[in-house]
Amino acid sequence: MSNKITEAFAKGKAFIPFITCGDPSLEITEQLVYAMEEAGADLIELGIPFSDPTAEGPVIQEANVRALSGGVTTDKVFDMVAKIRQKTAIPMVFMTYANVVFSYGTEHFIKKAAEVGMDGLILPDVPFEEKEEFDTVCKQYGLDLISLIAPTSHERITQIAKEANGFVYCVSSLGVTGTRTQITTDIGGMVKFVKAAKDIPCAVGFGISTPEQAKKMAAQSDGAIVGSAIVKLCAAHGENCVPYVKEYVKSMKDAVREA
């Protein structure tokens, strides 16, 4: 288990922003990482663009399209991370799809991710039953394969939690990523089941966009994950998005702190 991921949750409730690498450009992505860290982010999720991101709603899908048409490749993302690692040690995890890893070569991808300084990997389209081939290689190279747990049966939550590493990504609602007006899932109940099975941090994502929602979710867990709302700011402001994202992340981290 990556100690850096554990540390991200050791300072109180964590705020975890997500951005798509290369939207609007890899140079801006790099600047966003530094700005979000300054604004109080505890761990950063970096999305490696993929042509068919099944777990994503329209906002992140469009960001993937923009990044890919801008020429972003997995290798360019690795180079960017290596550059970021010269300036900051903030915990970072990749979020991408099995196909991105397969087409690069599973071991090659995971080894390279570890070499450039990533701490973990989230593969939303890989079900629990199929994670073994990735998990084994991740363990070999010291990368945490982060498990997602959606609203499901107590038994399944327990089964997934027992084998989880790093932190557990609790999915607040079934369906794709995006902003929701209301989150009705019993997050507190889900977190209790996870903690009963394993002593591991739980962060909640999918559908959080306002400070109020972030505070409410963090109150029932160890942190809040926000993607679409940040990606929307990148889409709206393009090359000038950094100060807007920084201000937003600060407001979200402040809310999470109060939880």
Question: Could you tell me what each predicted segment is?
Answer:
Residues 26-36, 152-162, 204, 208-224:
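Catalytic cores of alpha/beta
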Residues 77, 192-200, 209-215, 219-259:
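Alpha/beta catalytic cores of nucleotide-metabolism and tRNA/nucleoside-modifying enzymes
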Residues 41-52, 118-122, 127, 172-179, ...:
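Glycine-rich phosphate-binding active-site loops on the catalytic face of alpha/beta enzymes
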Residues 15-19, 44-46, 92-96, 121-123, ...:
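Hydrophobic faces of well-ordered beta-strands that scaffold small-molecule active sites
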Residues 60-62, 70, 158-196, 233-235:
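Glycine/Thr-rich beta-alpha phosphate-binding loop at enzyme active sites
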Residues 69-72, 117-130, 144-152, 158, ...:
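Catalytic beta/alpha-barrel core
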Residues 1-19, 80-86:
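N-terminal amphipathic alpha-helix/helix-capping segment at the start of soluble metabolic enzymes
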